[in-house]
Amino acid sequence: MLRINCLATYGGKLYAGGDRGLPPPGERQWTGRPYRVYRFDGGTTWSVAGELPAERPRNCYPHAMAVHDGKLWVGYPNVWSFDGARWEFAGTPRGDTPEDQLPHLQVHSLEVYRGQLLAGMWPEARVVAHTGGENWVDRGRLGDGSEINALTVYNGMLYAGAIPRGEISRYDGVQTWTSLRKFFSPPG
């Protein structure tokens, strides 16, 4: 891998996900080759914990990770879960994303809040909640943002960080978000 996008501790082990690195000599791209999640085995040893599809409709480029309900969850643009032995497709966190935006859909963050796995999305800065199986429900959009890069729980409340305005918002329930600050607010 050239880039590590996500790390998580699951089952007492460290897991890492990222890109596929450089293509083999003579090839221009990695078309069709799976993405991998690696498990740290100690010292300098890592093993492949799983291979995720690179082709649509169930593709997954490990960009975000979270641990929830006894499983490791990995996302971008779709979400997969790992129970320590087997990987399972958990759907596409679409929410209310318009049909024309679906080819661009990406998971940029994962977090657990009030017993549900949440995904922070691009291109519309939506938060989408996993409701079981391959099902997801929209939890609202953050202002005029385009991407949710960070989700966290603080003092029992859910917070999200979005670009392009460096905005931090708090979830107030159902589909309501309150903007706490825009760190980048150019005129116009």
Task: Label each residue range with its predicted role.
Residues 1-5, 9, 13, 22-61, ...:
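Trp- and S/T/G-rich repeat-edge/linker motifs of beta-rich repeat architectures
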